[in-house]
């Protein structure tokens, strides 16, 4: 799947203008891809049960990293502070928090389930199960919101809720959580002028075509320009400074333009295949920890891809969510590959058992 990016990344004019090197995006991503594939292979050959012991520590580590970002480093790239930078190397802790949340929830819910025949333990037990399960998740989400990064926060809440639902969380608690989350989301949008502008431009992209609605408008132009078969590899015009973030959050628009409707459907089909294999691995896992871990990794990828597709196609307001495995970005690519390595190990053990 990652190979799709070689035909869509703006590796020519855009990279030359920004960095003075025509292939810097491709070279950087290729290096990170090799590192990620190595990590994926190591985790694929490592028994996933070894992750059960220190899993409770991972959220704490990510919280510390996120606090370091907010309090000390404050790298104001695009008016945000989402990275810890060590010279030319940048780490995005919010991406690491995704795996940490999945590991913690799988570990915690597995511990609570010991001795029970069915995953019914968290239907009513709010104080002893739901609250301690979700508290570290909410801490991570709160810190990510402070960066600010609403898109990643929503993504984490979605796959965390999915894990809890499969573990037995009743619709009553989901409805209660939604009733609390929706007013909070409204406040987060209305209190931030740029978010409000994005929401208004989502309802009417033509209301501010040179301002808040510019990115969505250019994205839709790219998608519509592709037609059935696309304009051809490396022939995208929208990525040449017309479409902001063409190599990251809006790379799917470039794929639609270059490969057309057929290429766009193929990319979606690849994620469907990934999801199908991941869900099969989850249901065939030897134990509850593996089942929840596989489900968490799979839904992490699928929710993120769905949000990205929806943003690019103008179905939801614009958010900064990369397309898994394809968008340019080292932290996201590494997390997705490492998660896939764990998923492959679970699938392998399920097959052997």
What is the predicted function of each stretch?
Residues 1-9:
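Short, small-residue-biased leader/transition segments that mark boundaries at the very start
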Residues 87-97, 146-148, 227-232, 321-335:
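Glycine/serine-rich anion-binding loops at beta->alpha junctions
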Residues 306-353:
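A juxtamembrane structural motif centered on a specific transmembrane helix
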Residues 8-10, 24-29, 329-330:
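Membrane-interface transmembrane-helix boundary segments in multi-pass integral membrane proteins
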Residues 201, 205-248, 252, 259-263:
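TM-adjacent membrane-interface loops and short helices in multi-pass inner/ER membrane proteins
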Residues 16-215, 253-311, 338-342:
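Hydrophobic alpha-helical transmembrane segments of multi-pass inner membrane proteins, especially
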Residues 149-154, 231-236, 246-248, 261, ...:
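Transmembrane helix boundary and interhelical junction motifs in multipass membrane proteins
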